[in-house]
């Protein structure tokens, strides 16, 4: 019987000199790692191994959900019902607890949503307190995520989240204004896509906050 060298089994050279970028796992910061994240993590890591075996240089990217109005909600929740001691002791579980509490209370008091939007605007404007709390939540989450990745025996080359683009939106807005593409609609700023029979592209919300955009970075 012929012996198969398992170390080289399935290896190839068709990928030499080529690069493949794989974006996978991508959990939402301050929320528990669930089965959906596990599925994409396993699939992504399997693709990484296959491409690597074929000679490709593979960049493993974990694009975290680490920016958005939900962090304004979490900051409000932390200030109203949380404590530093509880978060440090219970980590993501405590963050999830107060986040759920926020939504329960917001059903009875809509002003909480206004406060959340205000805190997110502060984050976008570089407010030191807002960003410090957000970074703390993110760091706590990464400790838990990396623990899980270690159990699975995998790593990433880049932990690049939505927040990576937070200082790049202003340039996108300026370029759209220069080209007269930015239109005000119900207090928000959009790019109309009517000629393509598509819904408008939201650029700036009416509260002054933005959506993240990687257009300039990828181009």
PLM feature segments, named:
Residues 1-219:
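NTP-dependent nucleotidyl-transfer catalytic core
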């Amino acid at each position: 019987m012929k012996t198969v060298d398992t170390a080289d089994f399935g290896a190839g050279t068709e990928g030499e000199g080529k690069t493949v970028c794989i974006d996978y796992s991508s959990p939402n910061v301050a929320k528990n790692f669930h089965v959906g994240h596990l599925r994409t993590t396993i699939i992504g890591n399997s693709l990484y191994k296959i491409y690597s075996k074929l000679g490709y240089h593979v960049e493993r990217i974990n694009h975290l959900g680490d920016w958005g109005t939900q962090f304004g909600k979490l900051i409000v929740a932390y200030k109203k019902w949380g404590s530093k001691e509880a978060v440090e002791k219970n980590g993501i579980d405590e963050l999830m607890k107060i986040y759920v509490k926020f939504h329960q209370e917001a059903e009875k008091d809509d002003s909480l949503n206004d406060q959340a939007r205000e805190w997110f605007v502060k984050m976008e404007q570089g407010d030191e307190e807002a960003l410090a709390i957000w970074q703390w939540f993110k760091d706590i989450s990464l400790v838990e995520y990396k623990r899980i990745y270690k159990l699975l025996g995998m790593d990433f080359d880049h932990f690049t989240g939505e927040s990576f683009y937070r200082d790049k939106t202003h340039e996108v807005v300026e370029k759209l204004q220069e080209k007269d593409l930015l239109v005000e609609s119900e207090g928000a700023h959009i790019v109309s896509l009517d000629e393509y029979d598509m819904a408008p592209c939201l650029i700036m919300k009416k509260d002054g906050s933005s959506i993240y955009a990687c257009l300039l970075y990828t181009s």
